[in-house]
């Protein structure tokens, strides 16, 4: 799906790549749309597990955020078509896209609430934490260009990580 995009991926292509008969496809999915609707949420859960495992090694909010940020980009190296799947989903699998956004939003909200409860960040209301959540989510999307500028799938440059972390540290610690 990631190679060709949602529009150009057929059931024939999917089954050929998976090495299964088309009938087998229908044992697992009701339709082409069904697989489109399941793809992003499943991949999103894998991404959150990967990022969470990376972030869990940190002791503070800022350490966990840096490790999670780096973990997100290491996930992209494993799944280079993730951004294409994510960016095409609003048009081809809008329910899946909304489910994915909600899953990521809830994860970040939990992370930020816990940090606020532990005194690591101050001065943010619940509504403001939601804004922060979307800012952090968007940063990953747009800073991804530094890992794939020339169409390759590179590591995120360290200076980008440092700039991101500086913004997060100064933005969240002052309140």
Model regions: which residues?
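Helix-turn-helix
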Residues: 2-34, 38
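Short coil/turn segments at alpha/beta junctions that flank glycine-rich nucleotide-binding fingerprints
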Residues: 3-7, 58, 79, 118
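Short, basic, alpha-helical segments at the C-terminal edge of helix-turn-helix-like DNA-binding modules
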Residues: 11, 41-48
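Alpha-helical elements of Rossmann-like donor-binding domains used by nucleotide-donor carbohydrate transfer enzymes
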Residues: 13, 34, 38, 67, ...
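Short helix-capping/turn signature of helix-turn-helix
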Residues: 29, 88-92
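Hydrophobic alpha-helical connector segments
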Residues: 38, 49-78, 132-136
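Amphipathic alpha-helical packing segments from all-alpha helical-bundle domains
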Residues: 45-48, 75, 94-120, 129-137, ...
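Hydrophobic/aromatic-rich alpha-helical bundle segments in the mid-to-C-terminal region
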Residues: 84-88, 118-166, 175
């Amino acid at each position: 799906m990631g190679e060709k995009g949602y529009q150009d991926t057929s059931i024939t292509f999917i089954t050929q790549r998976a090495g299964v008969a088309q009938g087998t496809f229908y044992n697992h999915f009701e339709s082409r749309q069904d697989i489109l609707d399941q793809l992003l949420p499943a991949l999103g859960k894998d991404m959150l597990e990967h990022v969470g495992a990376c972030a869990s090694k940190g002791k503070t909010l800022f350490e966990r955020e840096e490790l999670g940020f780096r973990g997100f980009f290491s996930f992209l190296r494993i799944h280079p078509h993730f951004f294409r799947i994510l960016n095409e989903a609003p048009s081809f699998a809008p329910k899946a896209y909304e489910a994915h956004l909600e899953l990521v939003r809830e994860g970040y909200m939990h992370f930020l609430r816990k940090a606020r409860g532990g005194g690591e960040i101050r001065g943010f209301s619940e509504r403001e934490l939601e804004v922060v959540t979307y800012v952090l989510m968007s940063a990953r999307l747009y800073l991804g260009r530094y890992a794939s500028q020339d169409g390759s799938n590179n590591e995120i440059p360290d200076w980008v990580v440092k700039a991101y972390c500086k913004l997060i540290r100064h933005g969240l610690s002052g309140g």
